[in-house]
Amino acid sequence: MDPIDIAAVADDFDREVAATPAIDRFCSSSAWILAAAAALMPPRAPFAFRGASGYFAAMRGVHPAGFPYIEPVELAWGLAAPLIGRDPAGLAADVAGVLAARRDWQLAILAGLTADGPQRRALDRALPPRWERRRGTPTLRHIASLDGGLDGFLARRSRELRKTLRKGLRAAADAGVTFESARASPREADALYERIQGVEARSWKAREGVGIVSGPMRAFYQLMLPRLCAHGQQRTLFARQGERDLGYILGAVFEGEYRGLQFSYDDEHARLGLGGLLQLHQVTALCEEGIARYDLGTEMDYKRRWAEEVMETEMLVLVR
């Protein structure tokens, strides 16, 4: 395998991501991992390689305790898979060879692996038995099928949720709330993000310091959005009352799947149930577009009401 700069080969890298089985594709793609590396991760050195069977997307760092380590480009949530390629057996053998030939690491973290997936099985066969193997905490994502369009999606939701959405639609209509899609070119990405931030600043998330109004999380999405716009991936909806934005929902599509990223609403209008209505209108638009699945992201209680499938990945930690 040869060293590479992922940013320089991002389009080819993403094509391989699209063909890689049993991974979180969007969160392994260049838009997600490069933004995370720049905004959320500590300083590290590149450790990415390309070979005949695919890519190894990783970085090398030194822990404060002094030991060197290898980890995926994104490890803020551990969603990104570092082994990218359609031939898991060949790729695992190549990656094992790279790791065995290098003496500049003591611990290697391989995240984003499904426990019974082809990458994990191939690694079990390819890695030297003398290396200690540990399993990290699993990461869960909630995923909803959009099969059957909006009617099919709603039929798989609870009666209580459907009732809440109908009530919210009536309240929003009475309040003069409308919903509109916002597409943007790369040059318009900053303006779109400022519009998103205008809503975010008036949300309960900003008040409690858990949103994206400041700090690394603000930078993360600010770096990601131009890449999404450049490839036509971003999907943003706004809830509006006259000329005022009351709420937004932001996500991205990749290979027939939508990944929800963020949504917020003006806290003064919480009674309208805008969070659920933004989700509903986004699902409606996605169904019309022919998107097959909606990945709501990592574990949160409310997501269980909106999804029926759980994707679980885990972390393999190697110590030598």
Label the predicted regions:
Residues R134-I143, V310-R320:
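Conserved catalytic-core motifs of GNAT/GCN5-like acyltransferases
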Residues S185, E299, L316:
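Residue-level "edge-of-site" marker
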